[in-house]
């Protein structure tokens, strides 16, 4: 459903942010 799609999108964004912060600058 729509809510599920939004949740997936937010989860993906969150994962990307966590990955970026985990990478050495």
Swiss-Prot record:
<keyword id="KW-0964">Secreted</keyword>
<keyword id="KW-0588">Pheromone</keyword>
<keyword id="KW-0878">Amphibian defense peptide</keyword>
<dbReference type="GO" id="GO:0005576">
    <property type="term" value="C:extracellular region"/>
</dbReference>
<dbReference type="Pfam" id="PF16049">
    <property type="entry name" value="Antimicrobial24"/>
</dbReference>
<comment type="similarity">
    <text>Belongs to the frog skin active peptide (FSAP) family. Caerin subfamily.</text>
</comment>
<dbReference type="GO" id="GO:0005186">
    <property type="term" value="F:pheromone activity"/>
</dbReference>
<comment type="function">
    <text>Acts as a male sex pheromone that attracts females. Has no antimicrobial activity.</text>
</comment>
<dbReference type="GO" id="GO:0006952">
    <property type="term" value="P:defense response"/>
</dbReference>
<dbReference type="InterPro" id="IPR032021">
    <property type="entry name" value="Frog_Litoria"/>
</dbReference>
<protein>
    <recommendedName>
        <fullName>Caerin-2.3</fullName>
    </recommendedName>
</protein>
């Amino acid at each position: 459903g729509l809510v599920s799609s939004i949740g997936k999108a937010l989860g993906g964004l969150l994962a990307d942010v966590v990955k970026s912060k985990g990478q050495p600058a």
